[in-house]
Design a protein with these regions (language model features):
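Anionic-ligand binding region
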Residues: 42-45, 56-77
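Structured C-terminal cap/extension of enzyme domains
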Residues: 67-169
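Broad hydrophobic/π-residue packing in well-ordered secondary structure
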Residues: 6, 56-59, 92-93, 109
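Glycine/proline-rich, positively charged
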Residues: 1-57
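Small/polar loops that bind or transfer phosphate-bearing groups
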Residues: 36-37, 61, 80-81
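Short, ordered loop/turn segments at secondary-structure junctions
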Residues: 8, 63, 82
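Short linear motifs at secondary-structure transitions and domain/linker junctions
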Residues: 33-35, 52-55, 60, 68, ...
Length: 169
């Protein structure tokens, strides 16, 4: 099975040079094929993409700046908000392949607005699970210490999503 190094310093607290990890890691991990690059350091991402004549696959992990990662050469994206607005991301991928930056930016803004709402409600796990429930997929409550959503919060979340036309995406 292919192995990808999951680079997400904002959550793990581990911030190492990914390019060096890929080169040295490949010596010890034969099935290392790339990284899920969840960081906004696009300079470092570009170095990883160019390593050894594109030897490693770089998957972009920041939903709200996907077009930047694709423009740098990421081969794909992996993100939590793809679960509830997949058509937005498909439109970004398709329009980037066709060099239609206007459409890509239009859809990227939808992603950004969605992420802003999620952050307002406690971030990816808490806000994301609540959105999944609102679209009809109940993934259950978050584990402690993350507080479950109250009925009032669900109503406010729905209102904020309505304000950005989320249910029309």
């Amino acid at each position: 099975l292919p192995f990808y190094y999951y680079n997400m310093p904002s959550i793990t607290g581990v911030n190492l040079p990914v390019d060096k990890f890929l080169v040295e890691g490949k010596k010890k991990i034969p099935n290392l094929v790339g990284t899920k690059f969840t960081h906004n350091n696009l300079m470092e991402m570009g170095v990883c993409i160019e390593l050894e004549q594109h030897r490693f696959e770089v998957l972009h992990g920041y939903d709200e700046i996907l077009i930047s990662g694709l423009a740098m050469g990421a081969v794909a994206g992996v993100g939590s908000t793809y679960n509830y607005i997949p058509n937005v991301y498909q439109a970004i991928f398709d329009s980037m392949k066709m060099n239609d930056l206007e459409t890509a930016r239009h859809n990227q803004i939808k992603s950004i607005r969605t992420v802003e709402v999620i952050i307002k409600y406690g971030g990816g796990v808490r806000g994301g699970k609540a959105i999944m429930k609102l679209i009809g997929i109940d993934c259950g409550s978050c584990r402690l210490p993350i507080k479950p959503f109250s009925v009032d919060e669900y109503e406010k979340l729905r209102g904020d999503l309505d304000a950005i036309k989320f249910f029309e995406f």
